[in-house]
A protein has these predicted regions:
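Short C-terminal tail/terminal secondary-structure segment
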Residues: 1-6, 153, 233, 244-265
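Conserved glycine-rich cofactor-binding loop
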Residues: 13, 18-22
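C-terminal substrate-recognition "lid" of short-chain dehydrogenase/reductases
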Residues: 86, 221-250, 255
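Short, small/polar-rich loop/turn modules that mediate ligand/substrate recognition or access, typified
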Residues: 93, 180, 185, 243-245
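Substrate-binding pocket helix/loop in short-chain dehydrogenase/reductase
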Residues: 103-104, 108-116, 209, 213
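Alpha-helical segment proximal to the catalytic Tyr-Lys
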Residues: 132, 177-181, 241
Length: 265
């Protein structure tokens, strides 16, 4: 069941990093169903082609682009691919991310750098690469970055990811103010644990913590990928025309519950 008007995003062009799977793919699929043309960016060409095929099978317009968000020149290329294939770029979704559970005392410098590079540096590189095109969008440009509530709370084993996400939150607020004169809206979405994603599987299910973590959510369950996709549509659509510098928390109330030792992950 779709809750938005048909063709709500018609005429818009979106670039989604991490678009080959998980939340990035869910967002791209929903955008395409609502009329947006999409560029899917990721490092795994096979995943991107599979995702693009599924979107095309539903009538969507999509182009896969193999690239690493840690490489600024490659992100410039991704933006150029959007312009060359669809004539514009109106929406940037930063969904590429890296995370793993590791107590800080065991975290290697390389592990720290990897997450910071993908999450924080990658988000900045994508924003910078997209700026000149977003500022001439006829729909008012949108930047939507997927973060988590790790940046707002102290979660054991996630110092690296929490620091990266807090950095993205701060970056997004700064860009929201800096780029407001260009009518570019910069917002973030903070998902909670989402069923069917690699992150939830790796951090909770594979470690036998899924049932426990679901109980920590105020609504008593994990979210669905469509919950995050719907939030992204809201911010990308005319409903978000007066929203910038905001963080939309979509976690079923998870972050409001304290972290205790038996649910520290």
């Amino acid at each position: 069941m779709h809750i938005f008007a048909e063709r709500l995003l018609a005429g818009r062009v979106a670039l989604i990093t991490g678009g080959g799977s998980g939340l990035g793919f869910a967002i791209a699929r929903e955008f395409a169903l609502l009329g947006a043309a999409c560029v899917l960016v990721g490092r795994n060409g096979e995943k991107l082609e599979k995702a693009a095929f599924e979107i095309r099978s539903s009538g969507g317009r999509v182009v896969p682009y193999v690239g690493d968000v840690r490489d600024y020149s490659q992100m410039q290329g991704a933006v150029q691919a959007a312009v060359e294939n669809f004539g514009a770029l109106d929406i940037l979704v930063n969904s590429a991310a890296g995370n793993f559970y590791c107590p800080s005392k065991d975290l290697t410098p390389n592990g720290w750098r990897t997450v910071i590079d993908i999450d924080l540096n990658g988000t900045f590189f994508c924003c910078k690469a997209a700026f000149d095109v977003l500022r001439v969008s006829k729909f008012e440009g949108r930047v939507i970055s997927i973060v988590t509530t790790l940046g707002n709370t102290g979660w054991p084993g996630h110092a690296h990811a929490g620091a990266a996400k807090a950095g993205i939150l701060s970056l997004s607020r700064a860009l929201a103010v800096e780029w407001a004169e260009h009518q570019i809206h910069v917002n973030t979405i903070s998902p909670g644990p989402i069923a069917g994603t690699e992150g939830t599987s790796r951090l909770y299910e594979q470690r036998g913590l899924a049932e426990l973590q679901a109980r920590r959510v105020a609504l008593g369950r994990f979210g669905k990928t469509i919950d995050i996709a719907n939030a992204a549509v809201y911010l990308a659509s005319p409903a978000g025309d007066f929203i910038t510098g905001a963080d939309l928390v979509v976690d079923g109330g998870r972050w409001l519950n304290y972290v205790c030792k038996d649910s520290a992950a």
